[in-house]
Amino acid sequence: MTIDAKHYDVIVAPVITEKATMASEYNKVVFKVTRKATKPQIKEAVEKLFDVKVKSVNTLVRKGKAKVFRGSFGSQSDSKRAVVTLEEGHRIDVTTGL
């Protein structure tokens, strides 16, 4: 199984929040991914990088918040998250590095 550099470009970071931790009980892992990443690309990257079988991938786009910085208005960038459901018997420990 070969790992290409493109797999590292798809997944940005794991999301470690209370909600994501609760989802891990149901074999789900949440990752921050690039905006242009598609579901098949995310599935392939997770399977190659973590050596697991992916059951499904759900994505969502979080719109950036409007912010005021030193009196000028701006907005944070939009971000994309992927909720990856793993097959039974497979686990990913996101607290360890790649």
UniProtKB/Swiss-Prot annotation:
Q: Keyword Nuclease, does the record have it?
A: no
Could you give a GO molecular-function term held by this entry?
A: structural constituent of ribosome
**Record InterPro entries:** Nucleotide-bd_a/b_plait_sf, Ribosomal_uL23-like, Ribosomal_uL23/eL15/eS24_sf, Ribosomal_uL23_CS
Name any Gene Ontology BP term: translation
Name the domain of life this protein comes from: Bacteria
Q: Which UniProt keywords apply?
A: Ribonucleoprotein, Ribosomal protein, RNA-binding, rRNA-binding
Q: Note the SUPFAM superfamilies from the entry.
A: Ribosomal proteins S24e, L23 and L15e
Q: Does the keyword Cell membrane apply?
A: no
Q: Extract the Pfam families matched here.
A: Ribosomal_L23
What transmembrane ranges does the database entry give? Answer: none
GO annotation, cellular component aspect: ribonucleoprotein complex; ribosome
Q: Matching PANTHER family, A to Z?
A: 60S RIBOSOMAL PROTEIN L23A (PTHR11620)
Q: What family does the database annotate?
A: Belongs to the universal ribosomal protein uL23 family.
Free-text function comment from the UniProt entry = One of the early assembly proteins it binds 23S rRNA. One of the proteins that surrounds the polypeptide exit tunnel on the outside of the ribosome. Forms the main docking site for trigger factor binding to the ribosome.
HAMAP family this protein is in?
Answer: Ribosomal_uL23_B (MF_01369_B)
Tell me how this protein assembles. Answer: Part of the 50S ribosomal subunit. Contacts protein L29, and trigger factor when it is bound to the ribosome.
The identity of this protein, by name, is Large ribosomal subunit protein uL23
Organism of this sequence: Nitrobacter hamburgensis (strain DSM 10229 / NCIMB 13809 / X14)
What is the taxonomic lineage of the source species? Bacteria, Pseudomonadati, Pseudomonadota, Alphaproteobacteria, Hyphomicrobiales
Name of the coding gene: rplW
